[in-house]
C-alpha cells in the first residue's frame, strides 16, 4: 500500500487517500455496506458486480484471505473497487492463506485506503448511490477530468448485468447423502453457499445459465425451480421474467432470493424501482406479515419491488400477497402466491456472512416440493 489515490464521485466530491490493492483506474457505482464482518464474502458476491464498495467497519483485513469463505466459483472478486478506512497491517487468522491486499493485487482490484469512510457514507446516504471511480498511479489526473471519466460510465439504472456474472455452462452440485429432490437453479449471480444449503438438505442442484429456456428447465423434470441473487436492474431482465411466468404456469414450486424476489414480483405484475442507497449489511430487520415474527437478515440490493405491507393483488396465476417488509423503512422484502406454490424474499437466508434467522426458508421450499409430489 503506497502512493496517492482518489475516490471521485459524479457530483464532484473527491476523497484523497492512499492506494490499496492494484494500481490504476476502476469505475462503478459507489455503495456502502454496514457489515462489521464478512468482507471476503462481500468482495466475492456476484451481486456487487460493477460496484465500488465502501466499508463502514473502521478496520478491514484483520483475518486476511482464505480458501473457504468466498461466495463465487474460483474465489473471484466481483466488486469493481474497494474503499476502506484502516487496512489491518497484519493478518491474524489460522485459516488465512494470505493478506487481503495481496489478493486484491492478484485479482487486479483497484482500491483506496486512509479516507474518511464515515464522511463518504453520510454523503451517499444523503445524495444516494452514484457513479464513482478510484484512481491511482498513472490514472491520476486533473480532478475535473476524473469527474468527466466517472460521469461517462453507464448508470446502474437500466444495466442488464445478470448475464455477465452467470455461469456460461450448466453444472451440477450433488447432495450430501442420497438425493431427495432435484432443483433447477437459475444462476443470475448465485452465491456458492446457496447450492451448499440445498446439498445439506439432500437436494441435487442443476445450476443453469441465466439464458436458460423453460424447455431446458422442463427437460430436467425438476421438483422445484430456484431464482438466485444477482446484480443490475431487474427491469431489464425480460427473458428471465418470461421464463418465470412459464414456470408458474406449469405449477412447478418456485423459490427466489434477492434478485430472484424482484423477478418473481415482476412475473406477478409488480414493478421495480431504484432505491436511494439500498440495503447492504448483515443486521437488517424484516417483518413476516403472516406470523408477525421479525428476522435479522443479510441484504445486498439497490432495487426493490413497489408494494405495501400485506398488500394482496390478483395475478394470472392466482392471488398474491406482499409477505415481508423491512422494519426500518417499509421496503418490500418478500412476495408469494396465496396458495404457496411460489415465494421469494429480498434478503439472504443463506447468510454468508450474516445471521441465520431466515435459514428455515430452505426447509419451507422442501415442504413445498414434498407437498407437490
UniProtKB/Swiss-Prot annotation:
The keyword Amino-acid biosynthesis applies. Composed of two chains; the small (or glutamine) chain promotes the hydrolysis of glutamine to ammonia, which is used by the large (or ammonia) chain to synthesize carbamoyl phosphate. Tetramer of heterodimers (alpha,beta)4. GO terms for molecular function: ATP binding; carbamoyl-phosphate synthase (glutamine-hydrolyzing) activity; glutaminase activity. SUPFAM superfamilies: Carbamoyl phosphate synthetase, small subunit N-terminal domain (SSF52021), Class I glutamine amidotransferase-like (SSF52317). This is Carbamoyl phosphate synthase small chain. Keywords: Amino-acid biosynthesis, Arginine biosynthesis, ATP-binding, Glutamine amidotransferase, Ligase, Nucleotide-binding, Pyrimidine biosynthesis. It comes from the Bacteria. SMART domains: CPSase_sm_chain. GO terms for biological process: 'de novo' pyrimidine nucleobase biosynthetic process; 'de novo' UMP biosynthetic process; glutamine metabolic process; L-arginine biosynthetic process.
